[in-house]
Design a protein with these regions (language model features):
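The feature captures the catalytic groove of carbohydrate-active enzymes
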Residues: 9-43, 143-150, 187-255, 286
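Hydrophobic/aromatic-rich effector regions of fungal transcription factors
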Residues: 154, 158-165
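Active-site core of glycosidic bond-cleaving carbohydrate-active enzymes
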Residues: 102-139, 152, 177-180, 184, ...
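Short coil/turn linking the two alpha-helices of tandem helical-hairpin repeats
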Residues: 163-164, 235, 242, 356
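Acidic/His metal-coordination segments adjacent to aromatic residues that form catalytic metal sites
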Residues: 94, 133-145, 202-220, 382-396
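Non-catalytic C-terminal accessory modules of carbohydrate-active enzymes
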Residues: 359-509
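Acidic/polar, glycine-enriched structural segments that form the non-catalytic walls/loops
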Residues: 1-103, 169-171, 182-185, 238-239, ...
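Proline-centered turn/helix-capping motifs that create local helix->coil transitions or kinks
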Residues: 83-89, 187-201, 265-269, 308-313, ...
Length: 510
């Protein structure tokens, strides 16, 4: 039988099909090339599309893990990012999403570009940075979202980290005018915040947009966190290339940090066990719980690295996040007060990792993965299972590729992480990746010291593991640290060396 149409509402047309319909192909086309197609043509298209994507030169195999599902999500994350990529003016531009997030967001782009650089695609990431820099305003600042002062600090971080990951100090020197200008912007913003010396934000940042669960223009801390992190990155960059500005910028950072600590002490609120937490808003609203908007705090922990591991404020805010979990992720920190911001899991996991809790970071990785779709993609935010009473309550694009980048970043950093002049290996290795014959590998993954390769193989009887690490050649790398968790049995670890490759025979708890 034939199908018929039924109007079911304004701007809506429903197709009603006969009961005996077994197969259906839907083909949407427009323009002079549109035409009728057959069912056999439609059946062939999924295979042709899949084959096309398989033939692309994408960095699959750079990160290899023994959990098949996690590997599929990793590969999907790489593919998601490339499927949303566009070529503009001859340059590859990585888009955050395909529809409502198809555009330039500085913080999203920062971590997408970092993830791709990890995977050996530094040239493509650099093109994305060049595109980003075209959005610098006439006054030298970045203000794409409006009073989103943190964009300036984020760009400083991007420039510094990209130079480290690619080992290209000449590129950093070529961008030094931009670095110098952005440090000046941060100084200028701090001065503007002092117009009213009695204002809570005086000496920090003017009132601005928090994002990540908190709207409006407020005296708040997300812009403070990221501009502290950006200024710290500028200081480290100046030291790296021995720029004359290093001492002046370090003094500015010290003053900024001291002003922040004084304000944080004023605004901290009592929590459990004597802890003092810091809400994002300097004048908290009763309608906004302290857990809301804590994304930039997590970024300040890592990659910002502005807090020492034993900092009481950092420990208190982490306890706040720990106490607000649902399905293994932080609950109510984003735009949905009753929802889960899926890839906030990476921010949260990275903060735990940096503060020395690798096993918790590994747990968070799996909770993050458990919120992916069957095809390995994420919404930005969603309600916990069974709590979407209205139906269709979600936030963000689909797929949301910042999430894909964060999954790549978290897997990479659980396996290899830079700590100053040290390279730490297996600090957040999931225990479930250590079954008999399991293999975990990194292949020429970019680090601050150059590419690193790693191969961990568990023996057939599960009683030992062999680790091979090909160490980067940078003279800045002073120490290679291998983390042996509860999975390693007490006993002597046998070590040897073949050129730049270090070998470890590790006895395991069976």
């Amino acid at each position: 039988g034939a199908w018929r149409t039924s109007k079911t509402g304004k701007n809506r047309l429903t197709l009603v099909f006969p009961d005996d319909l077994a197969e259906l192909a839907v083909y949407c086309a427009s323009g002079h090339e549109a035409g009728e197609v057959g069912l056999e043509w439609a059946k062939a298209q999924p295979g042709l599309s899949a084959g096309w994507w398989r033939r692309r030169d994408f960095p699959y195999g750079t990160l290899s893990v023994p959990d098949r599902t996690m590997q599929e999500i990793l590969d999907s994350s790489i593919r998601n990012i490339y499927q949303a990529r566009e070529i503009k003016n001859g340059l590859p531009i990585f888009q955050v999403g395909p529809t409502c997030y198809r555009g330039l967001w500085v913080v999203d782009g920062c971590f997408i570009l970092e993830a791709m650089t990890y995977l050996g695609r530094g040239a493509e990431a650099r093109a994305g940075i060049d595109h980003l820099l075209t959005r610098q305003g006439p006054d030298g600042s970045f203000d794409i979202l409006g009073k989103y002062w943190k964009e300036n600090g984020i760009v400083l971080y991007i420039l510094y980290r990209h130079a480290l990951l690619t080992g290209d100090m000449e590129w950093l020197k070529a961008k030094w005018g931009t670095v110098r200008t952005l440090v000046g912007v941060i100084k200028r913003l701090r001065e503007a915040s002092r117009k009213n010396p009695a204002a809570p934000e005086a000496g920090l940042m003017p009132p601005g947009f928090s994002d990540g669960g908190i709207g409006g223009i407020n005296a708040e801390y997300t812009n403070v966190y990221w501009n502290l992190a950006g200024l710290r990155a500028a200081v480290e960059a100046a030291r790296l290339i021995q720029a004359p500005e290093a001492a002046d910028w370090e003094a500015e950072y010290s003053d900024f940090w001291a002003t922040f600590r004084k304000a944080a002490k004023r605004d901290a609120k009592p929590y459990r066990d004597g802890l003092m937490i810091l809400p994002v808003l300097m004048a908290p609203s009763p309608d906004i719980l302290p857990v809301r908007g804590q994304w930039a705090f997590c970024h300040a922990v890592f990659p910002g690295q502005i807090f020492e591991p034993d900092d009481p404020l950092a420990r208190a805010n982490m306890a706040l996040l720990d106490d607000n979990q649902s399905e293994g992720l932080v609950y109510g920190t984003g735009w949905m007060a009753n929802g889960i911001w899926n890839y906030f899991g990476s921010f949260y996991g990275h903060a735990h990792l940096w503060l020395g809790n690798g096993p918790k970071a590994a747990e968070v990785l799996y909770a993050f993965a458990n919120h992916a779709s069957p095809l390995g993609a994420w919404r930005e935010e969603q309600p916990p299972a069974g709590q979407d009473k209205k139906g269709g309550t979600f936030v963000g694009d689909m797929p949301h590729n910042w999430a894909s980048a964060e999954f790549i970043r978290l897997v990479r950093n659980l396996l290899v992480l830079e700590r100053g002049q040290e390279l730490h290996v297996l600090e957040g290795l999931p225990r479930s990746w250590l079954f008999a014959n399991a293999e975990t590998a990194l292949k020429d993954v970019a680090t601050d010291f150059g590419p690193v390769s790693l191969h961990l193989k568990v023996s057939a009887d599960g009683r030992s593991a062999t680790l091979a690490v090909t160490k980067p050649e940078s003279p800045r790398l002073k120490k290679l640290v291998v983390h042996l968790g509860a999975w390693a049995r007490e006993g002597k670890v046998l070590t040897s060396r073949e050129g730049r490759t270090y070998l470890f025979e590790i006895p395991m708890v069976k």
